[in-house]
Amino acid sequence: MARTKQTARKSTGGKAPRKQLATKAARKSAPATGGVKKPHRFRPGTVALREIRKYQKSTELLIRKLPFQRLVREIAQDFKADLRFQSSAVAALQEASESYLVGLFEDTNLCAIHAKRVTIMPKDIQLARRIRGERA
């Protein structure tokens, strides 16, 4: 059989409408008859990125005040009983603590990225603290 040369033909417009399979048609008609609608889900990572942007913009404290205050009092009990704290002292401790933790997590994230990972692990925190000189 001899080969024939194919010539280009002009398109007649858009795609022809395709017939739906029976399963697709059944699926589309189900929610209309009172089926339960699934809640909307974002793709993995979308919400995380949104939260990152939100918390980078904000300046408010992220740890709740009363649980942090209880923790401070519990730790202080080991050193001296019946210590009293000014509210400004607890606020200063909380501000310093959150600032330290945010910086540590930034360094931890850099350690994870350096290891070609996107998930932080305890070994990343240990490496970040060791590089900082906080722990040998």
UniProtKB/Swiss-Prot annotation:
The record's function comment reads:
Core component of nucleosome. Nucleosomes wrap and compact DNA into chromatin, limiting DNA accessibility to the cellular machineries which require DNA as a template. Histones thereby play a central role in transcription regulation, DNA repair, DNA replication and chromosomal stability. DNA accessibility is regulated via a complex set of post-translational modifications of histones, also called histone code, and nucleosome remodeling.
Give one Pfam family, short name only: Histone
Q: Which residues carry this modification: Phosphothreonine?
A: T12
Segments forming a coiled coil: none
List every position bearing N6-methylated lysine. K5, K10, K19, K24, K28, K37
Q: How does it assemble?
A: The nucleosome is a histone octamer containing two molecules each of H2A, H2B, H3 and H4 assembled in one H3-H4 heterotetramer and two H2A-H2B heterodimers. The octamer wraps approximately 147 bp of DNA.
Q: What is the lineage of its organism?
A: Eukaryota, Viridiplantae, Streptophyta, Embryophyta, Tracheophyta
Residues bearing N6-acetyllysine?
A: K10, K15, K19, K24
Keywords of the record, alphabetical order, are: Acetylation, Chromosome, DNA-binding, Methylation, Nucleosome core, Nucleus, Phosphoprotein
Under what name is this protein listed? Answer: Histone H3.2
Sites of the modification Phosphoserine? S11, S29
Q: Which GO terms describe its molecular function?
A: DNA binding; protein heterodimerization activity; structural constituent of chromatin
> Which PANTHER family does the record cross-reference, listed alphabetically?
HISTONE H3
Note the InterPro entries from the entry: Histone-fold (IPR009072), Histone_H2A/H2B/H3 (IPR007125), Histone_H3/CENP-A (IPR000164)
Subcellular localization: Nucleus, Nucleolus; Chromosome
Tissue occurrence: Expressed in bicellular pollen, root tips, shoot apices, young leaves and ovules.
GO CC, one annotated term: nucleosome
The answer on whether this UniProt entry bears the keyword Acetylation reads: yes
**Which family does the record claim for this protein?**
Belongs to the histone H3 family.
PTM section of the record: Acetylation is generally linked to gene activation. Can be acetylated to form H3K9ac, H3K14ac, H3K18ac and H3K23ac. H3K9ac could compete with H3K9me and prevent gene silencing. H3K9ac is restricted to euchromatin.
Where does it primarily localize?
nucleus
